[in-house]
Amino acid sequence: MCIRDSYKTLEGARFYDASLKLYEGLSAELGFNLLFSQQGHLTLAHTDRAMFVMTERAEVNRLAGIDSRVIAPDEIQRLAPSMSMTPDAVYPVIGALYHPPGGIIRHDAVVWGLARGADARGAEIHPHSEVAAISRANGRATGVTLRDGRKVGAGHVVSATAGWSSTIAEMAGVGLPITTHILQAFVTEALKPLLDVVVVSSQMHVYISQTDRGEFLIGAEIEPWTTYRQQGTLNFLQESSRHTLELFPQLERARVLRSWAGLCDISPEFSPILGATEVEGFSISAGWGTYGFKAAPIVGRTLAELIATGSTPALIEPFALERFYRDRLVSELGAAAVSH
């Protein structure tokens, strides 16, 4: 899973930067190796327009104190010597936004580590327990009812349910401006080390990294249609493979091990919806699209502060649901070259 904080708005950049800093110390805090490798992140530019966008993002990042800069092809080649830089390619690489603190982390290790830490601190985890309803009394959320009929009371209910965010929020009487799409990815067989930086291309709609086990992890953009059906498509495999081979032709004979599709909840301007709602005792962490994993630590910390104090932390104030009614949007549309 890719981790970075090179976003295009000051609100977003500062928020994700706080999360990245928490990730840097999370292995030690949890006593669990999360396999976090800050190997760097390259967002490729293939046109003059793309170079302008990269320069703009680099300036926003600089204002937020984030290490992010535009680099030329010779430095790109030094960072990714195995990548094809042929000038007569369909999409020639003319520059890139280089973000040194970015990198990859094992998502399953993060989940296991956080679950173990939560359990050690007295939290109860109920896997495979579907929520069927949110209980309310006098306009306040008071708990949840599970599909098997069990009721769980709570002083505060938080929905952090990704693709099902709008469905869960409706149970509490809250409408969210969210659509649900699928995001696909696949991995190859393990290969010798070829790439130690994350490579992303917006025009090719592909992102590529190599795991510590040698597998190449390859993904693309969210699919344009709305669905809850988590089924991959042949077109994704064909197009992603084609563009990957334009950058790394040496992968021509690599075998695909597995592919998958997950659900993403997308807000109108690709920024999250965070914090309290008009229903007392019901808060949300929604609208993450493809960015949510990067923000997990800081979301947990800020929502815990909101629940404990009743006040919204300044870091998440810009992402309140009410911004859509006040025309105070925080547009991160295009902040990811592709969905990662």
Task: Please report, for each region that a protein language model flagged, where it lies by residue.
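Short beta-strand to alpha-helix junction loop
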Residues: 14-17, 44-53, 97-116, 126, ...
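Dinucleotide-binding Rossmann-like beta1-alpha1 core, especially the glycine-rich loop
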Residues: 4-82, 205, 235, 243-245
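Active-site substrate-recognition segment that forms the wall
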Residues: 31-40, 133-135, 140-141, 151-280, ...
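C-terminal catalytic lobe of FAD-dependent flavoproteins
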Residues: 245-340
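Short loop/edge segments at beta-strand edges and connector loops
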Residues: 38, 72-73, 127-129, 258
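Surface-exposed helix-capping loop/turn segments at secondary-structure junctions
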Residues: 26-35, 60, 64-68, 122-124, ...
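Helical element adjacent to the flavin cofactor pocket in flavoenzyme catalytic cores
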Residues: 96-156
